[in-house]
Amino acid sequence: MIPILGELFAILAAFCYAFGSVAATKNARENGGRGNAVLLSIVLTAGFSGGLWLMVGPSLPPLDADVWVGVAIFVVAGILATVLGRIFFFRSIELAGAIETGLIRRLIPVFAAVLAIFFLGETLTAASALAFALVFAAVALVVVMARGGAAAEDADAVRASRERNAGRILAMLSAASYGGSYVTRKLAMRWLPDPLLGAFIGAVAAFACFAAAAPFSPEYRRQLAAVLRRPTCWQLVSAASISLGQTAQFVALRFTTVTAVAIIGTIEMFLAAWLAAWVLRTEARPGPDFAVGSILAMAGVIVLALARA
């Protein structure tokens, strides 16, 4: 087995999440706001992970008490990430943009690392601590430089400041939900060590939550009905990217620590910025400070990979 298999899947997940966030922003701007990307991505996650499990996954173990404990914890993880985290995520990038949402959501490793220490007994190794320092130095650099140019940027902002503030709050809630989901997924695999089945269970649980809430929410009814309609190109790209990212993240958690996956996930911010600026052209091009931050963040990922190699 490849020594850094978990880290490689974590990098793939970060790229997929970054591309999905930028695609969602592009769809929001081209098609007048929010679409059905949240529920569509849940359906795609269930189909993708379930199909892979049937083709290459292990056989279903005997349905004893341990298996049901694992299933229950996977359900909680699905609600945290696929329902709460993803709803907050999609709406925040529509209100605040891919770059700012990605910046605020860098709190995910903080939530994940603290919870992993308490619930999983993980410890910060020297390599993890160095990687953590490099990545957060990168984030701090970008935050400081962004504050310096905030007034000029806000004067020309297309979105109202109230919407941007709402997007920032939702990004914070998304970070807390995703941080908790990392830990619950890893915890569930102590009883049911099958990442593909875990991704499928989480997606099905999330879909059930939407279906149960639909009679009480016109918005959820609209989203359920929208799944039956043909999605826009960018809705499909965004949902598929996020679904692939979530499945890859499950696999990463099977082979490495929560802390490592969370730290590597931080590079999503930098990947999203470069994709938004140079590939899909939905945001302004990052400046030299962002380039330096990107190098620091990648250095942190390299430190983690070398420590595991």
Q: Language-model features: where?
A:
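A helix-boundary/kink motif common to multi-pass secondary transporters
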Residues: G32-R34, G97, L120, L124, ...
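Membrane-interface interhelical linkers
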Residues: M1-V76, R86-A96, V144-M172, V204-S243, ...
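Selected transmembrane alpha-helices and immediately adjacent juxtamembrane segments
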Residues: R162-R190, L196
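Loop-to-transmembrane alpha-helix entry segments
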Residues: R105, A116-A152, R281-V303
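Hydrophobic/small/kink-forming positions within alpha-helical transmembrane segments
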Residues: A18, G50, G78-V83, P109-V114, ...
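Juxtamembrane helix-start motifs in multi-pass secondary transporters
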Residues: N36-V38, T101, L197-G198, V261, ...
